[in-house]
Amino acid sequence: MQDQERFIWPHKDLLDVTQLSREQIRHLLDLAGQFHEINQRPVKKVPTLKGKTVVLFFAEPSTRTKTSFDMAGKRLSADTFSLAKSGSSLVKGESLKDTALTLQAMSPDVIVIRHTSSGAAQFLAERLECAVVNAGDGWHAHPTQALLDAFSLNRAWNGQFEGKTLLILGDIAHSRVARSNVHLLTRMGARVRLCAPRTLLPAGADTWPVEIFDNLNKAVQGVDAVMALRLQLERQQAGLLPDLREYASRYCLNLNHMQHAAPGARVLHPGPMNRGVEISSALADAGQSLVLDQVASGVATRMAILFLHATRKDTGDR
């Protein structure tokens, strides 16, 4: 790819956005931009990773992320294979070690893993010679989602993160997406606000480089983008939030809220959406919504991620 020969990707694995420098994030976003252009062509497949093997190991249910990675690999001409969770034994560390040995025997070039346990991706990365890409581990991290969100915002903000403000709204306590976006966007120079009921804020959030609100009307003032998060309905059963009607009356993002945001402010949602709970249907379908753009961005961004990790120079760094 253009300029790739002059930039050596130093990381064997992508486990968390915290491992990436600002320059590396910018390079990845620029590369994703090239793949995004390719994806607009009538023929979208390129021979870039022909002969490479990508294994999709999803030990947690996923439709969007798994499909996005599968499409990304196929558009790069890689051979992609899916390995599904089989039984409860994969949850335990010893069985995950056995799984790592099984995967190693397949001689893949990249393994994409999603797992219910925080740290599962790192566990594999420390035991495998091939590249490991974290597609979400427990509540810990979801680096590829944060990178695709940054790619969507990069396009919407004309490449300028400095001086921009993103509001993240909803169930932040249980969101690996929120954690990864906070780390990535603040590293790129953006400001981040959080808005949620106190019961849905993570412990230690007051030490993050963010502003925290529990009032949406105040939180949305002057922001350049709002990311509404999926409300995990099982949290209501755990007593962490009131009934859905009361939650929606206070935290469902709508067109009226966006009138108080900065001119041209955009709306994001990592999906799947609970319309009328986290975001109104009218706003989700409005012109300022980037929800469908995030889906397209996901394929291009994951093409860049697979390309970098399947072709990187062997520096020994993680």
UniProtKB/Swiss-Prot annotation:
GO terms for molecular function: amino acid binding; aspartate carbamoyltransferase activity. It comes from the Bacteria. Pathway: Pyrimidine metabolism; UMP biosynthesis via de novo pathway; (S)-dihydroorotate from bicarbonate: step 2/3. L-aspartate binds at K92, R176, R230. Pfam families: OTCace (PF00185), OTCace_N (PF02729). It catalyses: carbamoyl phosphate + L-aspartate = N-carbamoyl-L-aspartate + phosphate + H(+). Its EC number is 2.1.3.2. One of its GO terms (cellular component) is cytosol. GO terms for biological process: 'de novo' pyrimidine nucleobase biosynthetic process; 'de novo' UMP biosynthetic process; amino acid metabolic process. Transmembrane segments: none annotated. Keywords: Pyrimidine biosynthesis, Transferase. The keyword Transferase applies. Carbamoyl phosphate binds at R64, T65, R114, H142, Q145, G271, P272. InterPro entries: Asp/Orn_carbamoyltranf_P-bd, Asp/Orn_carbamoylTrfase, Asp/Orn_carbamoylTrfase_sf, Asp_carbamoyltransf, Asp_carbamoyltransf_Asp/Orn-bd. The keyword Transferase applies. It is an enzyme of class 2 (transferase). Catalyzes the condensation of carbamoyl phosphate and aspartate to form carbamoyl aspartate and inorganic phosphate, the committed step in the de novo pyrimidine nucleotide biosynthesis pathway. Heterododecamer (2C3:3R2) of six catalytic PyrB chains organized as two trimers (C3), and six regulatory PyrI chains organized as three dimers (R2). Belongs to the aspartate/ornithine carbamoyltransferase superfamily. ATCase family. This is Aspartate carbamoyltransferase catalytic subunit. It comes from Oleidesulfovibrio alaskensis (strain ATCC BAA-1058 / DSM 17464 / G20).
